[in-house]
Amino acid sequence: MEPLVETVIEDGRWEELDLPALATRAAEATLAALDMPAEGFTLVVMGCDDARIAELNGAFRQKGKPTNVLSWPSEERASEEPGMAPEPPEPGDPEDPEPLGDVAIAFETCQREAAEQGKPVTDHVTHLLVHGVLHLLGYDHVEEADGDLMEATETRILAGLGVPDPY
């Protein structure tokens, strides 16, 4: 059986926060909240630094500056109706799980934002990982109604993890 989350650590500082455990916990909670079987899916989380995420942000979003988290869904899953939850993907089987996509998260930006917001960095990272996984599942915040849905979904998932409402 493949693990739900494959973690790639490009910046060793992520090991201090135990990114693999944070990523697995966030992904499992997100899928469970949406009634999706964790054993039917897989995703990749890369822990990197600001320089690497700025490079990726420039290449994929034409914004050559650091950001906190980026995600690349394996396929388009967004809902056609603003404010409506996207249709969940069909799970694979445990031996051949359905790939959801990739998430990258930047160490310095996460540390800085957590300090600015006066919250534990692990809570902030957990929030951003839930946010990234929701993007892989088709959630977005382009339209106001979609943003409201995504924030409410994040808040519900985070509450189940004991993380206070980030909004």
Swiss-Prot record:
GO cellular component, alphabetical, reads: cytoplasm
Gene3D superfamilies with a match to the protein in the record: Metalloproteases ('zincins'), catalytic domain
Residues given in the record as Zn(2+) binding sites: 131, 135, 141
- What subcellular locations does the record give? Cytoplasm
Keywords linked to the UniProt accession: Cytoplasm, Endonuclease, Hydrolase, Metal-binding, Nuclease, Ribosome biogenesis, rRNA processing, Zinc
Principal localisation:
cytoplasm
Q: Which cofactor does it need?
A: Zn(2+)
EC id? 3.1.-.-
Annotated region (Disordered) at 64-101
Q: Which PROSITE patterns match?
A: UPF0054
InterPro entries noted in UniProt: MetalPrtase_cat_dom_sf_prd (IPR023091), YbeY (IPR002036), YbeY_CS (IPR020549)
Q: Name one GO biological process term.
A: rRNA processing
Record has Zinc as a keyword:
yes
- Record GO terms (molecular function): metalloendopeptidase activity; RNA endonuclease activity; zinc ion binding
How does the cofactor attach, per the note? Binds 1 zinc ion.
| Catalytic class of the enzyme | hydrolase
Q: Which SUPFAM superfamilies match?
A: Metalloproteases ('zincins'), catalytic domain (SSF55486)
Sequence ranges of Acidic residues compositional bias: 90-99
UniProt record similarity statement: Belongs to the endoribonuclease YbeY family.
- Task of the protein: Single strand-specific metallo-endoribonuclease involved in late-stage 70S ribosome quality control and in maturation of the 3' terminus of the 16S rRNA.
What name has this protein been given in UniProt? Endoribonuclease YbeY
